[in-house]
Amino acid sequence: MTTRCPWVGEQSIYIDYHDKEWGKPEFDSQKLFEKICLEGQQAGLSWITVLKKRESYREAFHQFDPKKIAKMTALDIDACMQNSGLIRHRAKLEAIVKNAKAYLAMEKCGENFSDFIWSFVNHKPIVNDVPDLRSVPTKTEVSKALSKALKKRGFVFIGETTCYAFMQSMGLVDDHLNDCPCKTS
């Protein structure tokens, strides 16, 4: 690849993330759940910080299996607070457990998480015209609606900006620059 989106920089972990994951449509409910939880961990930080800790999160949070996470106790969160591989912010760590419970409540009511998430973009990616980084929004009416709907279902740490970053990363919107080789044609 020659011209990537300029936010990628030179770190190989970020280059791989950009080239192989970011903006690629993902429909697997558990992967979407993992990502929305990780996006919540980013609040106030840079994504690279979370990306470098992603494997530690997977280990600490049972590969993001909502059923196992929902059973985690305050003692489990105490252990997470001692784990240097995680962002040691109690409310953010507790949010993963709360979000697992909300996810399971949706499932119990017959709501498929992937179908729910993708319904906000009519089940197909929105490909935006992105001539430069200045034209990329940080939130949209759709991300506001998604945030509101998730909060109504009990999710936390999922504001409208976090939801937009989630939508970008999971391919609900394609915000690759127009001249980026990863841009949907």
From Swiss-Prot:
GO biological process: base-excision repair
Swiss-Prot/TrEMBL keywords: DNA damage, DNA repair, Hydrolase, Metal-binding, Zinc
Binding of Zn(2+), residues: C5, D19, H176, C180
EC number: 3.2.2.20
Family matches, as Pfam families: Adenine_glyco
Top-rank EC class of the record's enzyme: hydrolase
Cited Gene3D superfamilies: Hypothetical protein, domain 2
Single Gene Ontology MF annotation: DNA-3-methyladenine glycosylase activity
Catalytic activity: Hydrolysis of alkylated DNA, releasing 3-methyladenine
Function: Hydrolysis of the deoxyribose N-glycosidic bond to excise 3-methyladenine from the damaged DNA polymer formed by alkylation lesions.
Name the UniProt record assigns to this protein: DNA-3-methyladenine glycosylase
Gene name of this polypeptide: tag
